[in-house]
């Protein structure tokens, strides 16, 4: 089953209005009302056309509840508020919170650290499932992805702008250098699509890397049967933490030390050789035949 895509199915279904992309190589700019903090990983989007394109990637219907993570100066927030009556903006910087509450008064703006967000509680409060959108601070991309995966039952969709290298890892195929933990877990428990790249010039300050927008769909049809996320994550992490070793060595705590064999002679393969579906089969096998091993 194909569970990841590159550059496919990324058109907007949330609004009939089309966005325009500037033909000039010099993007339009919107003013930044305060100095970005490097400690918060702030690179503010200032191009209105790119903002329209990113917001247009969200497939949420008008009645859906949308949560923006790291709303910053409100470039996405304003456009989201035009499309959705129920909008929550999470922001850790008190300066940005003040700007957001003035600029987008109809949004529920909350001063909070996204790493402390209880997505299930927020979904219950707002009548979920939630749709998440974010120009993600690069240093928070992985924590946010794992947090969303861990609480995916209350989510329907996420549209995240991130470093292009990370986006490519998410949709990577087996037996490639980019294929790893994020690839397996996101392709197993969700449906990620790499939609388009975002040049550094549309941010202020300008980052040193190119970004990309990834849309991640969650739902019952993306859930593997009889497989618990925490168990799968434990096996996948152990396998890729020693990716140059054969699985019989990297997973020896569940196999060799417990006299448990591998299906299909997979013990002779490296982690990068197994597809996400094969990892699911292996995880079910270890769940059935091996005792749990505490996290290191």
Curated annotation (Swiss-Prot):
One of its GO terms (molecular function) is 16S rRNA (adenine(1518)-N(6)/adenine(1519)-N(6))-dimethyltransferase activity. Residues 12-24 have a biased composition (Polar residues). It catalyses: adenosine(1518)/adenosine(1519) in 16S rRNA + 4 S-adenosyl-L-methionine = N(6)-dimethyladenosine(1518)/N(6)-dimethyladenosine(1519) in 16S rRNA + 4 S-adenosyl-L-homocysteine + 4 H(+). Coiled coil: none annotated. Gene3D superfamilies: Ribosomal RNA adenine dimethylase-like, domain 2, Vaccinia Virus protein VP39. InterPro entries: KsgA/Erm, rRNA_Ade_diMease-like_C, rRNA_Ade_Mease_Trfase_CS, rRNA_Ade_methylase_Trfase_N, rRNA_adenine_dimethylase, SAM-dependent_MTases_sf. Residues 1-11 have a biased composition (Basic and acidic residues). Residues 1-24 are annotated as: Disordered. One of its GO terms (cellular component) is cytoplasm. Keywords: Cytoplasm, Methyltransferase, RNA-binding, rRNA processing, S-adenosyl-L-methionine, Transferase. Its main location: cytoplasm. Belongs to the class I-like SAM-binding methyltransferase superfamily. rRNA adenine N(6)-methyltransferase family. RsmA subfamily. This is Ribosomal RNA small subunit methyltransferase A. It comes from Salinibacter ruber (strain DSM 13855 / M31).
